[in-house]
Amino acid sequence: MRHRKSGRQLNRNSSHRQAMFRNMAGSLVRHEIIKTTLPKAKELRRVVEPLITLAKTDSVANRRLAFARTRDNEIVAKLFNELGPRFASRAGGYTRILKCGFRAGDNAPMAYIELVDRSESKAEATAE
């Protein structure tokens, strides 16, 4: 029985899930908006929000924790230099999930997940 087990399995083993969310978190931090399936977006929110909360307090220990979770120095730099200060006054809720219809091949529900205070120049580039 799966009583009180949190998180979705997403038909993957644990190492595949961990690698997938590590890559997706890096993409979300880098591009500030990504398109994925709705269940993956909802699970990704549980990975990215604690990373941004960690980035609000800049210290060597926090940078090492963030690197351990993302394995990418470029992502760690953006988290602590841009996103941490940007969300300093916001107490959680750094991401927004927007449903965007269904995928053509398998009718899977799709969604955009984006950072809330995303800069408008990136929004215009994504729209084009």
Swiss-Prot record:
Keywords linked to the UniProt accession: Ribonucleoprotein, Ribosomal protein
Native organism: Enterobacter sp. (strain 638)
GO terms for biological process, alphabetical: translation
GO molecular function: structural constituent of ribosome
Highest taxon listed in the record's lineage: Bacteria
SUPFAM superfamilies named among the record's database cross-references: Prokaryotic ribosomal protein L17 (SSF64263)
Name this protein carries in UniProt: Large ribosomal subunit protein bL17
Subunit architecture: Part of the 50S ribosomal subunit. Contacts protein L32.
Gene Ontology CC entries for this record: cytosolic large ribosomal subunit
Gene3D superfamilies: Ribosomal protein L17 (3.90.1030.10)
Protein family (similarity comment): Belongs to the bacterial ribosomal protein bL17 family.
InterPro entries linked: Ribosomal_bL17 (IPR000456), Ribosomal_bL17_CS (IPR047859), Ribosomal_bL17_sf (IPR036373)
